[in-house]
Amino acid sequence: MSDKIKDKVDLLGMDRAELTEFFASIGEKPFRAAQVMKWIHQFGVSDFEEMTNISKSLREKLSKTALIRTPKIVSEQRSADGTIKWLLEVDNHNCVEAVFIPEKSRGTLCISSQVGCALECSFCSTGQQGFNRNLENWEIVAQMWVANKALGCKPKEERIISNVVFMGMGEPLLNVKHTFPTARILMDDNAYGLSKRRVTISTAGVVPAIDKIKESLDVSLAISLHAPNNALRDELVPINKKYPLEVLMPALHRYVEGGHSKKHVTVEYVMLDHVNDRLEHAQQLIELLGDLPCKVNLIPFNPFPNTDYKRSSNNAVHRFKDALMEAGVNCTVRRTRGDDIDAACGQLAGKVKDRTKRTLQTVNLDKLHG
């Protein structure tokens, strides 16, 4: 990036308050923030000259002081089932993936929050990639910007992207500095106007940040549980050694009890053959969840290169589901989507390693989530 560009303010990742402050700094009135925000996010404009209801003098001023940075689209892959995966280059070395999953009643965009992941979950392709860095505001919201533009989304028309889930590459709650402001942009009526219940942050269990969601965002929460006891979860989801179940579960109860709206937690549980899919595991899960308002989402494992795990049989999955349902636990089996383009759950980054600057490092989790 040239020094000339470095001196400019990047507007893509700014929320309305930040944009208002920026316009004040260049002698403009507060209403300009909402005006420009609509152009950027609702109309997909990245060139100030296209903002036709803004004076020529202001467009010239913006061109000298600001920019709207967008990522390079390295590839777009379309699955037979309609799923679309974008590989986006956010700098000269790093790529991230975003996935759009169309359904009859909604369209869900799955976005990434980090380049790689520090948590090293043993069944996840991204976890085997290693961790490089957190994504910045603009790099996260750019995934929505790209998808919105690629899908031809327009203001005042029926939403194509109705839901956004932070379930792509990385652990969102180890990057609250950037995921939280991005969530606010997604929910701003001058940007994408999503309701709080249509924005979901998924976590492997970063307990201090779960409490921050309740306090400052009030969006939906999904927990990547995957095991009903500490011994097995230590193996599958290593962050459990730092935040074991006896610490995690009370945090989930605090989440559903806080805020202004009735909440539940989505519990993600990947089904691994002869690892966590037996009826004894189902019974342990029933006891663990207790009276927590939740929905369990059973996820058939999606294989990736060099993994020893296998997908549970359909019979095992449905036995597990039936046991939960009989105990009164709301449970569904996720339909695998996009596996033919490596866009299914757990497959992201499986073929991105060569395009990503891999950094194997010991990560201080406390420092990372701030």
From Swiss-Prot:
HAMAP family: RNA_methyltr_RlmN. The keyword Membrane does not apply. Residues 103-340 form the Radical SAM core domain. SUPFAM superfamilies: Radical SAM enzymes. This is Dual-specificity RNA methyltransferase RlmN. Disulfide bonds join 110-345. Its main location: cytoplasm. It comes from Hydrogenovibrio crunogenus (strain DSM 25203 / XCL-2). Specifically methylates position 2 of adenine 2503 in 23S rRNA and position 2 of adenine 37 in tRNAs. m2A2503 modification seems to play a crucial role in the proofreading step occurring at the peptidyl transferase center and thus would serve to optimize ribosomal fidelity. It is found in: Cytoplasm. Its cofactor is [4Fe-4S] cluster. It catalyses: adenosine(2503) in 23S rRNA + 2 reduced [2Fe-2S]-[ferredoxin] + 2 S-adenosyl-L-methionine = 2-methyladenosine(2503) in 23S rRNA + 5'-deoxyadenosine + L-methionine + 2 oxidized [2Fe-2S]-[ferredoxin] + S-adenosyl-L-homocysteine; adenosine(37) in tRNA + 2 reduced [2Fe-2S]-[ferredoxin] + 2 S-adenosyl-L-methionine = 2-methyladenosine(37) in tRNA + 5'-deoxyadenosine + L-methionine + 2 oxidized [2Fe-2S]-[ferredoxin] + S-adenosyl-L-homocysteine. GO terms for molecular function: 4 iron, 4 sulfur cluster binding; metal ion binding; rRNA (adenine(2503)-C2-)-methyltransferase activity; rRNA binding; tRNA (adenine(37)-C2)-methyltransferase activity; tRNA binding. Pfam families: Radical_SAM, RlmN_N. The keyword Lyase does not apply. Binds 1 [4Fe-4S] cluster. The cluster is coordinated with 3 cysteines and an exchangeable S-adenosyl-L-methionine. Its EC number is 2.1.1.192. CDD domains: Radical_SAM. InterPro entries: Aldolase_TIM, Methyltransferase_A, RlmN_N, RNA_MTrfase_RlmN, rRNA_lsu_MTrfase_RlmN/Cfr, rSAM. S-adenosyl-L-methionine binds at residues 170-171, 202, 224-226, 302. Belongs to the radical SAM superfamily. RlmN family. It comes from the Bacteria. [4Fe-4S] cluster binds at residues 117, 121, 124. The active site is at 97 (proton acceptor), 345 (s-methylcysteine intermediate). Reaction proceeds by a ping-pong mechanism involving intermediate methylation of a conserved cysteine residue. One of its GO terms (cellular component) is cytoplasm.
